[in-house]
Amino acid sequence: MSYVYETYDAGNGVEFHPVALSLPADARGEVTAYFKAVDGVFAVGADQTGATLPMYAYAADAAPAQGSLGLHFKPLASVLSLTIGEEASKTISKITLEPVDPDGVEGHLAVSEAVVDPRTGAVTVGEDAAVSDILTMEIGEMSLVQAQTVNFLIASGTKVDGGLKATISCTDGSVFVKNLFEGQEVAFAGNCVGAATELFFRLRIATYEDMVNFAQECADDNGGAIVDLQADIDMRNVPWTPVENFTGTFNGNGHRIYNINVSADGRYAGFFAYAKGAISDVVFGSKDGTSYDGTSRIELKYSADTDTWCYAGIVAQSNNTLTGVTSFVPVTVTADSRCKSRTGGIVGSLYNGKMSGCRNYGAVSNVATAGVASYVAGIAGIVDGSGDAAGAITLDGCHNHGPVMTSLGLGNAVAGITASVMKTAVNTTISNCTNAGEIRFDNAGTSAAHRIGGIVAYIVDSCPTLVIDNCTNKGTVVSNMNGNCFIGGIAGVNYAAAIRDCTNEAEVKFVQANAAGAGYLCIGGIAGQTYSGAKVTGCANRAAVSSDKLQVTRIGGIVGTHNASTIDDCSNSGDITLAYTATANNWEAAGGIVGFYDGTDGTAVTNGCTNSGKVWATVNSSNANIGAGGIAGIIKSGNATNNTNDGAVWMHNAQAGKSSYAGGIVGYDYNTKDKSAVTGNVNNGAVQATVEGTSALLAAGGIIGRNDVGAVSGCRNFGAVACALHAGALVGWNKKSVEDSAAGGSVNGTALTGTNYAELAVGFQDGGSSSGITFGEK
């Protein structure tokens, strides 16, 4: 506060004119007079501190004594004293005040420059002054281990009708919002304390009525409380309107909320509609904390149109932190819903949020008959973000135990943990999560692209910063739906993300009893399809992977379709089965590690992997591209290096005269794009290729069944090879090169020895070459 003063009456009088008003007050809340008055007399040596309440002074009508000057001091501004009550483990960094109704302000909350009439106190705003109706106090750090009071200075003459909104930002990222003086008119007339109020962030809920009041507070834009749940709450099966605009901290303290009834013909179906803050340590849908209460439900039935995104979950849409949240509540998108939907057992949509230690036991399903897109998952429907590289989204230690299902036949993804991770969800980590619920598509009469995963169904476009780490699937993953289908024990479709140290322990299958379908099927024990630099490292599949679908099929123990990505140090011990008898003209590829290497986007690599599962393919196809291998069924573009197969491989084609290729490492290397490398691999498994009747397109090899363009080197075979036409200990039918490899095992019952290995190493040299071949014995 600055003053200009003028003397008059030969120095016997002085007028003070304040010309600047600096706001807000000191963050510490200290308020003292800028110039102290002592016995009504202005003392030149008065205290002038930086923590001040601006004052103005004017001469008294009469001097109190000869030779002295009488002055009146009055506050230039009013103080809004805000006490943040009760203890909380929070540290405040910033407080913002603004009117609830921007049109309800007379004057201005903050003025940078003004002139004050010394007698009346009337404020005239300077011509170049900056004015604002938003006050921001940058505090830095203020602990709330005990109640604190801060003081804001409000320009004299200001009136606010409708109340003020206080926004408290904390150092941990949480934000609380609270309305002050709601529905009141507050006048700041130059009093020392124009208004004072307490802001209690801690709200205690012990009864149903308390919960109703809490929901109303949030609806009134007072959702910034620290909520302590102090008892189990029976929601009485009364229709519940989802809590809106919750921005605070909800401490469940291990209590339960049960008999929940949400059936929303709106965009948000959940106990909470939208939450930004933190929710922790609370159980929904259980009276005893261990089982479903039998009545709770959350239903989304938005029937207005098909082009609107809707959300369903305990928290329908979340931009917050959820810790230790458990749900037994069934979450359903109903048959009469028509919207696009994102549905999760805990969260419908997780946006820039964090989840840890959350569990779902409730069934999650979408049985709508209309709508153009659906994401359904046991924990979070989708994971999305702002695309800001500085952010981090995490799901850690979350577990789904409930079945997850959709029968909607359009644009679908369904998974145990999250149905989809969007490309804007930068720096997302999904770690230490488990799915134990069955994951199912159930609509045999519909054809549409769909993705299914035990952990994640659809990693969209390119997510190079996404990591799926140490996750396990224990629930069966199954579909019977037509169209392009991507099924994986861990992930359905993986664009560019890293999947590492994950395990699938449950069957992955497509079941449709020889029904014909268009499109192609990619099915893997870990991932249905990998693209664009995706990495699968240190993963294990321990369960059967199978299909009886009459469709183009790429089926593998680890990955179904492998394109421009890498698979390192993975293992498969589950049996791989492709079985149909009806006639078709489809590509068919089955492998212990990879079904099909696709060359669309670039070279794919499989390195250091081991298969011990049986690869068993029976088809009825007139297509030339038919292959089964201990490591890969068919290679179009890519390399297989340093892998080991211990499982039996059998390919049978029920069409006479058609193709059937089987290899201990690769069934068919037809690579139309560039030369592939098959190096350093070892086969110990039995290999057999058969066809109904006879065929000129029949080959089996210990390393490759039919090799059109592959460079085979440094490989060893010790397995038994059987084929009625072209059979070789290393390659059955060779059009390229075989070098520096060891031939052992047997061919059509003849054991290889040091004298016959050379003639049995390659079954048919069709313009190819071989050199450096040695006898292989263990």
What are these regions (language model features)?
Residues 1-91, 138-141, 145-151, 156, ...:
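Short, low-hydrophobicity acidic/polar segments
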Residues 31, 78-80, 164, 225, ...:
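Residue-level detector of short, conserved catalytic/binding motifs and their immediate flanks
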Residues 34-36, 83, 96-98, 167-169, ...:
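Residue-level recognition of well-ordered beta-strand positions that form the cores
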Residues 38-49, 103-131, 177, 287-292, ...:
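Acidic Ser/Thr/Pro-rich low-complexity disordered segments
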Residues 72, 80-146:
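Short helix-loop boundary/capping segments
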Residues 123-134, 190-203:
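Short, surface-exposed secondary-structure junctions/capping segments
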Residues 202-778:
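Surface-exposed repetitive/solenoidal architectures
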